[in-house]
Amino acid sequence: MSGKGTSSRAYDMIMKLLLVGDSGVGKSCLLLRFVEDKFNPSFITTIGIDFKIRTIESKGKRIKLQVWDTAGQERFRTITTAYYRGAMGIVLIYDVTDSRSFENVENWFQTVTQHANEDAQIFLVGNKCDDEVNRQVSKEQGQELAAKLNVPFLEASAKSNENVDSIFYELASIIQEKHVEENIGGVGGASGAGGIDVSQNNSGAKNNCC
């Protein structure tokens, strides 16, 4: 998978993605690892909402991923739900070392389905899978919940960089396939929720990840 060194080329599509889940599950860490290939062990609470950009290649297309990192605290819930509109993909994250964050997944799923576009693709992620000593949620439990919710699932680790790229590449691929089905002309002309056909060069995208 290559998303490096070609930022001067035009991109074919923009995808707005949203990271949601309880506070402390590692949303910001996953995003930092994906975009900048860095890991910050310090817990820094997201205030409201933030976003980062990375451009990847998927199915022969240049996809500009605009990834929004939302606050997990209840007091920011009203603010962040406004950003669900237009999101083409939602990454719903829990912490495998925190059973409560896993128990809250279905509440988050309900919030997503209530506020996001009907065709938004949800992707379930169990973060911090490197910490087997403190694991409280098994991989099988995650798989069972994903099957119940009918969504794709991966365990990942921002710390060890396990499956971090895979989350976003797989989600982008699923969204592309949806748009191919909806737009016979291909994803380059997609104008649905968050999809933008552009002709100008994109020099600001961050591609410096492994």
From Swiss-Prot:
Protein name per its UniProtKB record: Ras-related protein SEC4
Family: Belongs to the small GTPase superfamily. Rab family.
GO biological process per UniProt: ascospore-type prospore assembly; autophagy; exocytosis; Golgi to plasma membrane transport; membrane addition at site of cytokinesis; protein secretion; vesicle fusion; vesicle targeting
Binding site for GTP: 21-28, 69-73, 127-130
Protein's organism: Candida albicans (strain SC5314 / ATCC MYA-2876)
Lipidation (S-geranylgeranyl cysteine): 209-210
Pfam assignment, any one: Ras
Topology term for the membrane: Lipid-anchor
Function: Involved in exocytosis. Maybe by regulating the binding and fusion of secretory vesicles with the cell surface. The GTP-bound form of SEC4 may interact with an effector, thereby stimulating its activity and leading to exocytotic fusion. SEC4 may be an upstream activator of the 19.5S SEC8/SEC15 particle. SEC4 probably interacts directly with SEC8; it could serve as the attachment site for the SEC8/SEC15 particle.
CC per GO annotation: cellular bud tip; endosome; extracellular vesicle; incipient cellular bud site; mating projection tip; plasma membrane; spitzenkorper; transport vesicle membrane
Gene that encodes the chain: SEC4
Annotated motif Effector region, positions: 43-51
NCBIfam families xrefs: small_GTP (TIGR00231)
Entry keywords, A to Z: Cell membrane, Cytoplasmic vesicle, Exocytosis, GTP-binding, Lipoprotein, Membrane, Nucleotide-binding, Prenylation, Protein transport, Transport
Gene Ontology molecular function, alphabetical: GTP binding; GTPase activity
Location in the cell: Cytoplasmic vesicle, Secretory vesicle membrane; Cell membrane
Lineage: Eukaryota, Fungi, Dikarya, Ascomycota, Saccharomycotina
